[in-house]
Amino acid sequence: SMGSLNIRQITTIVNTFKNNWSGAIGIHAHDSMGNAINNSMQAVNDGASWVDSTVTGMGRGPGNAQTEYLSIELDSYRDLDTNKTKLFKLIRNHFKPLKGQYGWGINSYYYLAGKHNIHPTYIQKMISDTRYDEEDIISVINYLKEQGGKGFNPDVLETARHFYSGNAQGTWKPE
């Protein structure tokens, strides 16, 4: 889904599995557009029996449903109050420094990629490469939005980097 599913789509998917599958149903939600927790909880509400998550959403690019947030929501859903002290201590002592070092998690570029069904690796590559400034990243996203970017291809990234779709301005003319 590239992280772009919404709760209505989750309900449709879970119901399709419930009607055609006798095994357990679960969800692994990406957080490109900040929907991972809501989508995970919708899947639980619709009958999913397991939910995948990672501490602080750790994962490639925008990451996944965050275990700490999911734990809070599941407690509310099940009217529980589990002790989260050890989890929060683990986050503060180990995962927060790792997240700072490796920079996973949602941002505006991943959100746009999710919205336009663009593979998150394009964003991951651009934000880790100093050749790309904000205008370059937006230009590449716009190119991929029009040309398609569901699967990552480094050659397409290079082509998109040099593609300019705006109106040229200036007075210089070759002689």
What are these regions (language model features)?
Residues 1-175:
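Catalytic cores and adjacent flexible loops of soluble metabolic enzymes
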